[in-house]
Amino acid sequence: MGFRMVLATSASVTALGLTGALLPTAPSASAATAPTVSDVRFGSFNLSSVSFDNAAAGDHRPWLKRRPVVVSQILGQKLDVLGVQEANQSKIYARSVNLGINQYTDLRNALNVAGGHYALTNEHAYNCVKPASTYKCVYRNQGASQDNRILYNTATVTMLSQGSVKYRTQTAGKNARYFEWAKFKVKATGKRFFFSNTHLDPYSAATRRGEWDEVIANTNRLHGSLPVISVGDYNTSKFAGYAARYLPKMKRAGYGDVLNQQYAQTVVKTPRAERVTRGWINSYNAFRRDVRHYSYASARHKVGNGIDWIFATNSLRVKEWSVVTNVDLTTLRVQGVLPSDHNLVRATLVL
């Protein structure tokens, strides 16, 4: 689940007196934003682990109740590459899935049963000689990355290579955190790109800072001359103190936020994305149906305080960025089953 301490509501931020310039409006589709063969659609989605099913209550429904909405949103957004977090890798929750041996294979298969054409960059659950479990594990690097996984649309992109790196910086006694990466080629154009996915530690700001440094170091080491798209749950809102350092550091490294958000500013003064959809809603919802608790519902020119990010090579054109949620804009309540305690975030880039 997401890091509660970084969740900022519009009320709390208003109390700080923080203001900014206007966001770009969300115009109707035009020649400038209409889909082209060069468009590639990316996303990041923290699924909320199936391991939490035993605690599911109220609007936090079990995985099998949430999965149809997850599938519908992913397919509806026509994503080419998606980074997912909390897609549990263990077989011990077999009773909570029915289309795979664990949560990420269950999701992959559910997407394809519904008409998708998705594959995982790596299906190995663990870095063991026998990678299906950790029982009597003999270490072997299988490229596994715990519950952090990359899905890609085989109809639109081809995977060229993939791997993962376990961060040196970890919080003792907690789940290991990984940097997961892959290189792809767009079938329609032949363009290649580097994609990474991560879920930074939720327990320690010091650990997150160390892991973020490793995101940059690993990206710089691995991407070569390819454009970069880096997504994930960074457990960091733009109001976290260290965001003042790391948001500019990502941009200086060559791959800034696709919205061009700045530390502690509620509105983007120099927009990068040409179109923003539901940008006033936070990416973390805590399984709450009323979006007024985690958005700027009364000031929709502002950007929500998300902890899920999409970074991309600074020179790439960003056609659109969106928070995906089934919110009724009249009642400000999410309709139907909430798919996760996070909202899917996605961006359309031109390669």
Q: How would you name each of these model-derived features?
A:
Residues 37-57, 148, 161-165, 181-183, ...:
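Active-site-proximal beta-strand elements of phosphoester/diester hydrolases
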Residues 42-47, 70-100, 151, 182, ...:
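Active-site beta-strand/loop signature of hydrolases that rely on acidic residues for catalysis
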Residues 37-41, 77-82, 113-120, 156-158, ...:
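Loop/turn elements at helix/coil->beta-strand transitions in domains of secreted/extracellular proteins
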Residues 65, 69-73, 102, 106-109, ...:
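Extracytoplasmic/secreted proteins, especially bacterial periplasmic and envelope-associated proteins
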Residues 3-13, 20-113, 128-132, 140, ...:
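N-terminal, active-site-proximal structural segment of metallo-dependent hydrolase catalytic domains
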Residues 88-192:
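Structured beta-strand-rich core segments of catalytic domains in phosphoester-bond hydrolases
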Residues 220-227, 236-351:
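Metal-dependent phosphoester-hydrolase catalytic domains
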Residues 47-51, 87-91, 125-129, 156-157, ...:
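Solvent-exposed loop/turn segments at secondary-structure junctions
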